[in-house]
């Protein structure tokens, strides 16, 4: 007698890849033409409790405020205005408490975000890129994390790309007989 296979798929996303992919997908919401960063906060039960991306504050027009990186006057740059992904993920949390949670983030946090992460009680930061490693902000963030006991580590992906194919839901699974 033949039966339809009931063996699970082997090519599913493991939790770390899933959470980092959610951070990267969230980053696609950013309107910043130069830097798209996303963050995903996860609790000990592998439940997402917060997602954020870099953008202007709620109620402030991202069509009016500047997106440039440099200008003669700092007020003509994005830096005094933009909210980082980490801030937005903490503020957008769907849980009353993120204490003890982990944060997956595309870019290693700056010192200002490190302070927010520490104050929120997040205990682990997993980042993809540390391209500003030698900056004063990243150095201060590492110092703060070390002092507060927040662990941080670089994410090592098992694959370099994850493809989202909206048409795949319409295909019928092949029926393999044993």
Curated annotation (Swiss-Prot):
Zn(2+) binds at residues 84, 110, 113. Keywords: Allosteric enzyme, Hydrolase, Metal-binding, Nucleotide biosynthesis, Phosphoprotein, Zinc. The modification Phosphoserine is found at residue 174. GO terms for biological process: cytidine deamination; dTMP biosynthetic process; dUMP biosynthetic process; nucleoside salvage; pyrimidine nucleotide metabolic process. It catalyses: dCMP + H2O + H(+) = dUMP + NH4(+); 5-hydroxymethyl-dCMP + H2O + H(+) = 5-hydroxymethyl-dUMP + NH4(+). Its cofactor is Zn(2+). Catalyzes the deamination of dCMP to dUMP, providing the nucleoside monophosphate substrate for the thymidylate synthase/TYMS. Also, part of a nucleotide salvage pathway that eliminates epigenetically modified 5-hydroxymethyl-dCMP (hmdCMP) in a two-step process entailing deamination to cytotoxic 5-hydroxymethyl-dUMP (hmdUMP), followed by its hydrolysis into 5-hydroxymethyluracil (hmU) and 2-deoxy-D-ribose 5-phosphate (deoxyribosephosphate). Catalyzes the first step in that pathway, the deamination of 5-hydroxymethyl-dCMP (hmdCMP). This is Deoxycytidylate deaminase. It comes from Homo sapiens. The gene is DCTD.
């Amino acid at each position: 007698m033949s039966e339809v296979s009931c063996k699970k798929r082997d090519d599913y996303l493991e939790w770390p890849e899933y959470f980092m992919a959610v951070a990267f997908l969230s980053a696609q919401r950013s309107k910043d033409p130069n830097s798209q960063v996303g963050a995903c906060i996860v609790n000990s039960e592998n439940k997402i409790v917060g997602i954020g991306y870099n953008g202007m504050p709620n109620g402030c027009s991202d069509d009016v405020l500047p997106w440039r990186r440099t200008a003669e006057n700092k007020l003509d740059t994005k830096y005094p205005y933009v909210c980082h992904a980490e801030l937005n993920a903490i503020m957008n949390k769907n849980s009353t408490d993120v204490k003890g949670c982990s944060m997956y983030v595309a870019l290693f946090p700056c010192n200002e975000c490190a302070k927010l992460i520490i104050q929120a009680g997040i205990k682990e930061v997993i980042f993809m890129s540390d391209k500003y490693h030698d900056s004063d902000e990243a150095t201060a963030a590492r110092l703060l994390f070390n002092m507060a006991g927040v662990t941080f580590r670089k994410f090592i992906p098992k694959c370099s790309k994850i493809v989202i194919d909206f048409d795949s839901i319409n295909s019928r699974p092949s029926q393999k007989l044993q």
